[in-house]
């Protein structure tokens, strides 16, 4: 009887050793879950809706405030308003309505999207509602925001919304192009911040290296 038990132990020993070796050296690494994207919120704490319209308003007040609006670019001979501006103060006209067009699904932080002025317009000017970034402006030594973009066009019409550490959001321009085509896209994700420059007394949205425009989104 003892001899049989001894032989049985000898037979089971390789299995135990193999099992121990497999357990210690061949652990299966399960993929870690990616963090869920955070939705962009409006001034009431509601998630932005692609089917709704919003005003882009500045966090600042008085001369530091002012809504974003569609206006005529100085010296432009185009048939339609084609510039993206910000009013000089939060006291005065309200901004032009916009809607956000994500690549798919909802509107989330740090996700590519298009921005469109959501206004009634004549057929001739329909294409002058989509935001884009223009060519390098020699006078300002930067690239100005204008309209005439194309939904889904990566080179000039893609933007992102990113959350500030304390309150509000920044807008980023994020093309999918070689770096030399966007010398201002310097962060790790190849994006540039949107701020303002003064053009003929108006605040024109443009790409900036510092002092980006801090904004909120107000549903209308």
Swiss-Prot record:
Residues 24-32 form a propeptide. The record marks 144-145 as: Reactive bond for chymotrypsin. Glycans are attached at residue 51. The keyword Glycoprotein applies. Its main location: other. The record marks 99-100 as: Reactive bond for trypsin. One of its GO terms (cellular component) is vacuole. Induction: Not induced by abscisic acid, jasmonic acid and wounding. It holds the Pfam family Kunitz_legume. Belongs to the protease inhibitor I3 (leguminous Kunitz-type inhibitor) family. It is found in: Vacuole. SMART domains: STI (SM00452). Inhibitor of cathepsin D (aspartic protease). May also inhibit trypsin and chymotrypsin (serine proteases). Protects the plant by inhibiting proteases of invading organisms. This is Aspartic protease inhibitor 2. Gene3D superfamilies: 2.80.10.50. The lineage of its organism: Eukaryota, Viridiplantae, Streptophyta, Embryophyta, Tracheophyta. Residues 1-23 form the signal peptide.
């Amino acid at each position: 009887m003892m001899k049989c038990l001894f032989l049985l132990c000898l037979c089971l020993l390789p299995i135990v050793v193999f099992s121990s070796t497999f357990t210690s050296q061949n652990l299966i690494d399960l993929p870690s879950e990616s963090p869920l994207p955070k939705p962009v919120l409006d001034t009431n704490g509601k998630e932005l809706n692609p089917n709704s319209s919003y005003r882009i308003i500045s966090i600042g007040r008085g001369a530091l405030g002012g809504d974003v609006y569609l206006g005529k670019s100085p010296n432009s001979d185009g048939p339609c308003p084609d510039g993206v501006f910000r009013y000089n103060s939060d006291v005065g006209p309200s901004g032009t309505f916009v809607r956000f067009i994500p690549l798919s699904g909802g509107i989330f932080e740090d996700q590519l999207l298009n921005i469109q002025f959501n206004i009634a317009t004549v057929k001739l000017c329909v294409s002058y509602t989509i935001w884009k970034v223009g060519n390098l402006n020699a006078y300002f030594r930067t690239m100005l925001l204008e309209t005439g973009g194309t939904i889904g066009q990566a080179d000039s019409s893609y933007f992102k919304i990113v959350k500030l550490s304390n309150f509000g959001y920044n807008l980023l321009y994020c093309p999918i192009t070689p770096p030399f085509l966007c010398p201002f896209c310097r962060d790790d994700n190849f994006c540039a911040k949107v701020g303002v420059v003064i053009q003929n007394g108006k605040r024109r949205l443009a790409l900036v290296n510092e002092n980006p425009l801090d904004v909120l989104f107000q549903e209308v």
